[in-house]
Amino acid sequence: MKNLIAELLFKLALKEEESKELCAQVEALEIIVTAMLRNMAQNDQQRLIDQVEGALYEVKPDASIPDDDTELLRDYVKKLLKHPRQ
């Protein structure tokens, strides 16, 4: 029983580490996108936003992906492009 608990705690620690890495990657990408948008002319920003939104609209998600997940992704992309980090 102790071995099972120790193994579960070890697996949980690994998952937590993976989660931290993913969070760091997302944060880094947000910073990069924000910096790029802030250094672009307004018309270039709008052109990029239109292209990204167009690409998202054209992509047909896999049937195995829940609609809520797809909508969450679209909303987050829109938020990041229209209202970058402060």
UniProtKB/Swiss-Prot annotation:
What's a BP term from Gene Ontology annotated to this protein? cellular response to starvation
Q: What is its main location?
A: cytoplasm
Q: Where in the cell is it found?
A: Cytoplasm
Statement: the UniProt record of this protein carries the keyword Magnesium: no
The UniProt entry's GO CC annotations, sorted and at most eight, read:
cytoplasm
Keyword terms:
Coiled coil, Cytoplasm, Stress response
Homology family: Belongs to the IraP family.
Q: Report the protein name in the record.
A: Anti-adapter protein IraP
Q: Which organism is it from?
A: Shigella dysenteriae serotype 1 (strain Sd197)
What lineage does UniProt assign to this protein's organism? Bacteria, Pseudomonadati, Pseudomonadota, Gammaproteobacteria, Enterobacterales
